[in-house]
Amino acid sequence: PHYRSQAYYDSAPWRATWKGEGGGVLLNQAPHGIDIFTWLAGLPVRVMAKTRTRRHKIEVEDEASAMLEYANGAIGYYHTSVNEWPGGSYMELCGETGKIVIANGKLRFHTLETPIQEFTEKNDQMWASPPLREEEVVVEETESGHKAIIRNFARAILYNEPLLSPGVEGVVSLEFINALVLSGKKNEPVEIPVNRDEYDELIEELKKRSKAKKVSGPTKRITDPHHLV
């Protein structure tokens, strides 16, 4: 996600509070990337997360990391932060016959000529590695950003146009986020689907302890310039 300074969080009393936002980087800045991540990899069945407030004077987390376990035995790792600049987005999906890398808007395929397990078992050369083919996938540019989603939503209402992002898909990302928040606060592994009663109890307790921030001057309502296109 994009970097955030203390001035951003101090722009309104509700920002970065459990009562006002209900979460930090995971719920506010990270969901766009989490949407893509869970769309490609699906939901894990278990997470072990570490959430912390590292550089800001706020109630909620500004950084989160997690080890992920999937039903098929795969292991994943997730990290997000608003403490880094320059920021960026990087995602890898590794499989039996290669790897997909998505980095800062570019997509690359790394295709193995021999499946990794087969090469590992049959190769007799000490320092050999499987031959591979690399290619960058040119993705056709389309209208994107908030403007495109809002236009699509309006056209769905007016003309029954299929939604690009149906609301039900957001539930998957929210389940992922809730699991990391719960695991981070408990400091122990959490199963997915999340125990609803346990999560609700945690959020209610955090909201009770939540306090609105004191801000100097009027509340600022300025759109993130990254989302104006």
Outline where the language-model segments fall:
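Predominantly a Rossmann-like dinucleotide-binding segment in NAD(P)-dependent oxidoreductases
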Residues: P1-K57, N187
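A general structural signal for well-ordered alpha-helical segments in protein cores
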Residues: G33-I34, H146, I150-R151, I177-N178
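Short arginine-rich
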Residues: F176-K186
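C-terminal glycine/acidic-rich active-site capping loop/insertion
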Residues: Y70, E96-V168, V190, N195, ...
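Glycine-rich, aromatic-lined ligand/substrate-binding cores of catalytic
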Residues: V45-R46, R54, S65, E69-I75, ...
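A short, glycine/Asx- and small/polar-enriched loop/turn
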Residues: E59-E63
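Glycine-rich phosphate/pyrophosphate-binding beta-alpha loops
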Residues: P31, H56, H79-G87
